[in-house]
Amino acid sequence: MAKRKRSAPSTTVVAGNSVTPPLALAPPQASESSHPPVNFQVITGSYDKVLHGFIVTIPPTSPSSSATSTSLTLNENDAISLPATFTDSFLFTAHTAPIRTLTISPPSANVLQKRILATSSADEHINLYTLSSALPPINFQKLKKATSTLTASNPKNKNLGVLSHHLNTPTAIIFTPNRSKIITAGLDAQIHILRTRDWAPLSMLKCPKPKPKPVNYATNHGDGYGPRIDTFNSEATYGGGAGGINDIALHPSQKILLSVGKGTRQVRMWNLMTGRKAGVLALSKEVVPPIFGSEGMKVVWSKTGGEYAIAFDRGVVVFGMDSKPKCRIRTTPISKVHQIRYINLPTTITQNKKDTEEEEEEVLTISTEDGRVLFYSTTGLESLDSPNLIGFLGGRSIGMPGRVKDFDTIALKGNFHLITGGTDGVVRIWDLGKDSEKDTHEMKKVRIDGGEGRQIGCLVGIYETERRITCLGVMEMGDEGIEEEDVEMSDSGSGSSSGSEDDDDYE
């Protein structure tokens, strides 16, 4: 009888097969001379209406040289040993329709407190939960079916309730930096501002609906005498269709809000101090080429508030505070854009040649349909159509062609981690390495349609959720027993009035 080889306890992933990495039974024990491991929780939403939370543990002494993404090659019979371990936290059905978006409230400064999780889907509801930031007891059983509750492994997690103020699908949820208010937008063309202390509505902003064009029955409907069946759209009855809001972005000063909508080539600016429209920027074909798309899908402010970016189906346009275009980004090869965010990267990775004492640089990050996450610098550009590509992660060059629906970043203990998730159900943990200057200079350049781009970062973990991911969020986790109770939230920062752009007076 042949002897079976004992499997190693480390997390392994076999490329080409849908194999779920084994669940970590316990976090690795750090030695007295080493730093404690990095712990954070990843929450994913999926087409299967399921919320899945799991804790990622990364040991302090991870072999970055052996896991460098540039030297990573996935073949059918190869196995990769990665340092990150995973522990399931909760897995349950949260909505009656696929989850559209989720948002986690910002952390408190220098204090580990509970966080608020808000999720939305096409069922018109926004579910609210309280998540504990303390590490739960180790769960030795992997959660495979969505039969558990939010408190499956941590009884400190709580269900706060449901918000039902939208008439159609909520598409965007934002918490203010001081966590005192929550801003939601939906396909019903409404923006609501609520107070998180008692979830009382404070303000409602309404975008106007585009006027329908007259229908020429003889021209548009052929020989028929009535409209075609596809002209009867139930979305118009419930506040959907053209004019619905795709995304919103809050300025760091909490005084200005941007919104982009369906069927409109424009971006609206709202004054939150008065609760009224501040202006409308029409996006002409000279500014946004037709190949980019017909409507803005995502909008985001930079962390400094000096610029904002609008993502279309196949391109991104960056505007300054004067609303003049600074940069137009068209990925090479051309691919659909799914998510954009501004993040801070160490200057050792960006290779900024300017004489500056700053250790970090803010870059625009874009995820695409072909599995890449691209990093662009929006400063020091030569022309409008010459973006500065710093590098990218993933993609077909290293055997990761699956679309990246969403991503998020977290910086803990001097380490920069980027977490990606896609419809293939795989969550990947990347270490962007603040101290990886040596690896940065040795990174291999990959040729892309006549141009060159470098793979940056190290892959430290892969986890298969076995569900099609639509959105994700990340939050820091601390040791059990150091979590403090919630403090009274401040109400300063934004207006508390109701209005729309058609109002003549403001009270």
Feature map (PLM): residue ranges:
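WD40-repeat beta-propellers
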Residues: 54, 126-131, 191-195, 267-271, ...
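WD40/WD-repeat beta-propeller blade N-cap
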Residues: 92-99, 143-171, 206-245, 283-295, ...
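Conserved strand-to-loop turn within each blade of WD40 beta-propeller repeats
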Residues: 45-48, 120-123, 185-188, 195-196, ...
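Structured C-terminal portions of repeat-based eukaryotic scaffold domains
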Residues: 38-40, 46, 302-303, 307-483
